[in-house]
């Protein structure tokens, strides 16, 4: 599901809100989440999951085109850990 699809689905389900209002709310929510992670804080949405930063240590990688070694710096990357309710719902899916 893309952001546009999410906006459309929420606007359809919440008929009292316009698509523009839903779009604004989603953009603001995502902006607040990004700002929180930028400041190094953790985000927890009970039942859904948590977002945090994990440190990736410096390492030697490879350039896929040339095969040559490349030194990669250490960095923080966003990490999502699903909550219990979300894990249980996904586990129950028979694909």
From Swiss-Prot:
Matches recorded under Pfam families: Bac_DNA_binding
Gene Ontology biological process: DNA recombination; regulation of DNA-templated transcription; regulation of translation
PROSITE patterns linked: HISTONE_LIKE (PS00045)
Name of the protein this chain belongs to: Integration host factor subunit beta
Family: Belongs to the bacterial histone-like protein family.
Organism: Shewanella oneidensis (strain ATCC 700550 / JCM 31522 / CIP 106686 / LMG 19005 / NCIMB 14063 / MR-1)
Gene3D superfamilies documented for this protein: IHF-like DNA-binding proteins (4.10.520.10)
UniProt keyword Transferase present: no
């Amino acid at each position: 599901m893309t952001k546009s699809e999410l906006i459309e689905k929420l606007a359809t389900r919440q008929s009292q809100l316009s698509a523009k209002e839903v779009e604004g709310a989603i953009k603001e929510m995502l902006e607040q989440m990004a700002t929180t992670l930028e400041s190094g804080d953790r985000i927890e949405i009970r039942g859904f999951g948590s977002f945090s930063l994990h440190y990736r240590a410096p390492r030697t990688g490879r350039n896929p085109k040339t095969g040559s070694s490349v030194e990669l710096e250490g960095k923080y990357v966003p990490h999502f850990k699903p909550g219990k309710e979300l894990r249980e719902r996904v586990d129950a899916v028979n694909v």
